[in-house]
Amino acid sequence: MMKFFSTRDHDHIVTASQAIAQGLSDEGGLFVPERFPQVDVRALCQLDYPTLAAAVVSEYLTDYSKDFLAEATRTTYGEAFGGKAGYLAPVEGDTYALELWHGPTCAFKDYALQLMPKLLVEAKKNLSRTEKTLILVATSGDTGKGALDGYHDIPGVEIAVFYPTGGTSEIQRLQMATQEGANVAVYAVRGNFDDAQTGVKRVFGDKAIAAKLAERNIRLSSANSINWGRLVPQIVYYFAAYAQLLKAGKITFGDEVDFCVPTGNFGDILAGYYAKQMGLPVGRLVCASNQNNVLTDFLSTGTYTAKREFYKTTSPSMDILVSSNLERLLYHVTGSDAEVAGLMKNLNETGSYTVRPETLAAIRESFDCGWSSEEQVAGEIRARYEKDGYLCDTHTAVAFHVAAQKKRDGVPMVVLSTASPFKFPRSVLEALGHTAPENDFEAMQALEEATGRTAPASLAALRQKAERFSTVIDPAGIAEVALGYQA
């Protein structure tokens, strides 16, 4: 049985079901597995995506039945992904794009957030829990819609999503504001993503709020990547990318493959670290940042400084200064809950921390880094389209730019393409040298005409949908929202 414990308290031990149902540990730590399971990579590479997902996920979720996981992954990664779950597209030479935006909401978050509601419902069954689950989600754009789509009308669950007002693309905002479902709510928060995320974390850490909700038979949980249930499905597509390179004869088994990941909250790239620790021949994990390059600075110097200027960029899902999942990596590298707790205390109190030189050296064994300016992002979108005929969004362009700097001769580079270019039509259109209309839907149409590509139907359909949610609150209001729920 795989056990999980908190990054800040090694003695706080839970099962996978408990980790997924609870989300965050009581003292604010994140749940991590006690060990990295070793797998038969060659055998896994023979499997189709749903079967591969069941095999990888079952290594960690050992208190779930294998039959349940097989059925859950089969129903999740089939029709909804249009036959393109974990699809690897050749771009140029031995650089590839792992297209993770063929799911229902056109972003990589679908891989976790379409499966995670099934995992939560089953976790409650495993634990014989009957309370209502209130899920609070802070989002910089894609997680919000992914979570709303996954959890809407799930029995026994209520979900409230908080996004920074003006901090997403208009398409991302409309995806959330038009969400259907009787159990969903969406709020714009004054401030940036970190304000929203801090507000949500504060509610999770408030024992008085938990007690009041418990009186009404309500328990809090998270759908952000601080929840283990968000992270584990993302490990799968690293194996899928490697398998496709094998099948295409681009590598022989055992060859290393590098991955470049556009990174905000550090969850997507951390999943690659887990894949590597499980035995997948991952070479370098390249962390690509936008102008909010706090992670590039940390991976270069060992000092994490969240107190810095915040930039609103064309890649809003990465406009993050407090990168939550880095805490998990720090735990795995140091092995010390006390050390991690101390670092997080420093971050909370002073806005920064510095790791020991040997800790940074251990991290650099697996990770590299780089960042892209706004000008470089636009140039990369245009270059990829004009040179390779490859149309990408702003976040993917951040990674393509960094990947080109970090490419090793003879080692394939897989860039994780995290969102459809049609989620950010104005930015992509302008990067291609066109004047973008103010309206996102007109821009979407213009992008279709300019490139001959078709926008995903779910995005085009937003134009006809009525907006349901328009409330704007201060970060302090997140607690009031939580306390407003009744069983």
What label would you give each PLM region?
Residues 1-487:
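PLP-dependent amino-acid enzyme catalytic core
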